[in-house]
Swiss-Prot record:
Ranges in coiled-coil conformation: none
Lineage: Bacteria, Pseudomonadati, Pseudomonadota, Betaproteobacteria, Burkholderiales
Gene: aroK
Keyword flag Ligase: no
GO BP terms in the entry: amino acid biosynthetic process; aromatic amino acid family biosynthetic process; chorismate biosynthetic process
Protein name, entry field: Shikimate kinase
Cofactor(s), by name: Mg(2+)
Organism (species): Bordetella avium (strain 197N)
Residues annotated as binding substrate: 69, 93, 115, 172
SUPFAM superfamilies according to UniProt: P-loop containing nucleoside triphosphate hydrolases
InterPro entries, per database record: P-loop_NTPase, Shikimate/glucono_kinase, Shikimate_kinase/TSH1, Shikimate_kinase_CS
Signal peptide: none
Chain residues that bind ATP: 47-52, 153
Length: 209
């Protein structure tokens, strides 16, 4: 069963990804524990806040955080855009699926997946079967605002990046919802407030397992 949680009531703008990540690492203290050590997987569009929120959740829960894109970069020794340039999207997706298959076997982690990780049916199966999946959702306008200055997004290197985001959202959102146990509307809430709002939702969901 998928629960939809709207956490958009805050009025403050979400900091930049770099600022929010620093807040997550430096300011969030351990706040809670979950009854199980099931891994928590974050899915959603680029710019939805998977890395930032993932780091904050890991800090709050005292867990290890893994960013799948960063894991791929560490394995390949180059940035994601370079992998795309050399091997194309198909080559990147193959590497992504291999890394996902390995990372999802680890207990007690917070894993931020890439925006397109859900495209492969086998990846979706692994996410559903091996952990708790949070779909971090934001509007196309908010996604565009957050990614407009980011040059590390090869799929947005187009003449109309906002239109590309909209097309990707139409294609991918049904897949995010297919695997999601919880849908979290990230909105424009400060990262610390957002993390504190997500934690009780996770605790309530785990108690039902």
């Amino acid at each position: 069963m998928t629960l939809s949680v709207n956490l958009c009531s805050g009025a403050e703008a979400l900091p930049t990804e770099q600022e929010a990540a620093s807040l997550a690492v430096e300011c969030i203290e351990p706040l809670a524990q979950l009854p199980h050590d099931l891994p928590i997987f974050l899915v959603g569009m680029m710019g939805a806040g998977k890395t930032t929120i993932g780091r904050g959740l890991a800090r709050a829960l005292g867990r290890e955080f893994i960013d799948l894109d960063h894991e791929l970069e560490a394995r390949c020794g180059v940035r994601v855009p370079v992998i795309f340039e050399i091997e194309g999207e198909a080559g990147f997706r193959k590497r992504e699926s291999t890394a996902l298959q390995e990372c999802t076997q680890r207990r007690g982690i917070i894993l931020a997946t890439g925006g397109g990780a859900v495209l492969a049916e086998e990846n979706r199966r692994l996410l559903r079967e091996r952990g708790i999946v949070l779909y971090l959702r934001a509007s196309v306008d908010e996604l565009f605002r957050r990614t407009s200055r980011d040059r590390n997004r090869p799929l947005l290197a187009t003449a109309d990046p906002r239109g590309t985001l909209n097309d990707l959202m139409i294609k991918r959102e049904p897949l995010y919802k297919e695997v999601a146990d919880l849908v979290i509307e990230t909105g424009a809430m400060p990262i610390t407030t957002l993390i504190k709002a997500i934690l009780p939702k996770l605790q309530a969901y785990e108690k039902k397992l």
